Amino acid sequence: MNKKVIALLSSVVLTAGMLVGCGSKGMKDGSYKSEFDTFDDHGWKGQVEITVADGKITDAKFDYVNEAGDLKSKDAKYQESMTKASGIGPVEFSAQYAKALVEKQDPTKVDAITGATTSGDDFKTLADAAVQHANDGKTETAVVKAKK
């Protein structure tokens, strides 16, 4: 009788394991965007776009846009003033955060960059929303409530 119980329990455990393995979700291939719902006090709104192929992030973009549609990374005056103040500007930190996401595949594993920690927090929040949409296969832009 003990052998029957052990055999039954073994089959239940194996079946459950197979169902869990088959049911696991991964990121769906495609492009996924996220952005904050409002502009910050300086007139910028963060945005992230990721591209997923074969279940992995193959490309990422991070930037801020103003109401006119201009990108922070293209604003030479902002780049110069931020670089003077903190040692790094949006041209560098935007690319570095995006590259780190492609390498690590997980927003929570992306390290903060000295001089751009607030932007790093924004990036992680937005990248996490984009990854959630990729996991769910939602192609509409994820709109994230901005921190005040």
Language-model regions: role of each:
Residues 1, 23-25:
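Absolute protein N-terminus
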Residues 12-13:
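Repetitive helical segments and hydrophobic/amphipathic motifs
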Residues 17-21:
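C-terminal motif of bacterial Sec signal peptides marking the signal peptidase cleavage site
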Residues 26-148:
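Active-site- and interface-proximal helix/loop "cap" or "latch" segments in soluble metabolic
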Residues 1-9:
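Bacterial N-terminal signal peptides that target proteins for export
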